[in-house]
């Protein structure tokens, strides 16, 4: 084999080949036959003894680390509504009626019939449309979600995934979006529920280690790292980067809980009023990595991300 052919084959082996598998209720993404994540587009029924109203769809679980470890948790005993990697809001209003796709009391996200996917050696792209609907009328959309997820090949120490989430009011009335009003904590937005069986959790932001729980934080990124296997020293983790186009960037709406929760909460504790036809877009990069935040050099990965956005 000549040197050029050897180099080309090495690059392809490093980049990997992406493929999707559709099992009739979820999409499983693989790179070189190694699972990356599973996206649930059909409603997932709760396991016993979780109450039936917690059925949900439109979220990622399991999300896998670079060495095949499961990073996420679904239906955790302490918060039944937490679900892998997801986005949802609790104390929102459709007109004057509460619509809760967070606790899932009277409404939930449903995937519409259009699901597009493409895959090659350089990236995998998942494009889909969901909507929020009340349980009493599941076909009548209130809020439309247009989602694009771009997954890049695993590198030596990390994998990057870009999320673009566009929300449009498709109802006849106003929608008021906000985070949780309970104690004005502001829960709601782009959320990651780590596997709590693997704690303790180490949170790191641009300002350094975050030792206590936080309901707001001045940082454009946050990392959470935790043992690959409970009780052992080897770590893996996940970082969330805010895109510079995020409204209010850098947005302080971070929620960090050491029981096992990382949220980029937007609009956090402020109301966001949407008239019919109004829309907004949230963009994030998710980085899965081996080791701690420091070992993966997450600050440098964030700076490279910012540089790339500025050059576009």
What is each model feature region?
Residues 33, 128-130, 163, 169, ...:
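Short, hydrophobic/aromatic-enriched beta-strand segments in well-ordered soluble domains
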Residues 174-246:
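Active-site/ligand-binding surface loops and adjacent short beta/alpha elements
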Residues 238-312:
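Beta-strand-rich recognition/accessory modules
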């Amino acid at each position: 084999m000549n040197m050029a052919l050897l180099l080309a084959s090495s690059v392809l082996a490093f980049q990997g080949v992406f493929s999707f598998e559709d099992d009739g209720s979820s999409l499983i993404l693989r790179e070189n036959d190694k699972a990356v994540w599973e996206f649930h587009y059909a409603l997932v029924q709760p396991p016993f003894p979780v109450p039936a109203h917690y059925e949900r769809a439109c979220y990622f679980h399991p999300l896998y680390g670079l060495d095949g470890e499961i990073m996420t948790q679904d239906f955790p005993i302490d918060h039944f509504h937490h679900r892998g990697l997801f986005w949802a809001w609790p104390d929102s209003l459709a007109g004057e009626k509460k619509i809760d796709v967070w606790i899932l009391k009277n409404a939930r996200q449903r995937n519409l019939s259009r699901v597009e996917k493409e895959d090659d050696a350089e990236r995998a792209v998942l494009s889909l449309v969901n909507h929020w609907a009340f349980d009493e009328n599941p076909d009548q959309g209130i809020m439309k979600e247009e989602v694009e997820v771009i997954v890049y090949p695993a590198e030596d120490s990390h994998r990057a995934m870009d999320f673009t989430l566009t929300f449009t009011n498709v109802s006849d009335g106003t929608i008021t979006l906000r985070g949780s009003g309970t104690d004005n904590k502001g829960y709601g937005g782009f959320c990651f529920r780590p596997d709590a069986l693997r704690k303790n959790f180490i949170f790191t932001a641009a300002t350094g280690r975050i030792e206590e729980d936080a309901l707001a934080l001045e940082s454009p990124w946050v990392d959470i790292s935790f043992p690959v296997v409970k009780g052992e020293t080897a770590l893996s983790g996940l970082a969330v980067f805010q895109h510079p186009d995020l409204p209010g960037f850098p947005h302080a709406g971070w929620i960090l809980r050491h029981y096992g929760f990382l949220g980029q909460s937007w609009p956090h504790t402020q109301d966001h009023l949407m008239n019919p036809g109004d829309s907004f877009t949230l963009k994030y990069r998710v980085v899965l990595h081996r080791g701690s935040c420091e070992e993966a050099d997450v600050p440098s990965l964030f700076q490279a991300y910012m540089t790339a956005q500025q050059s576009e």
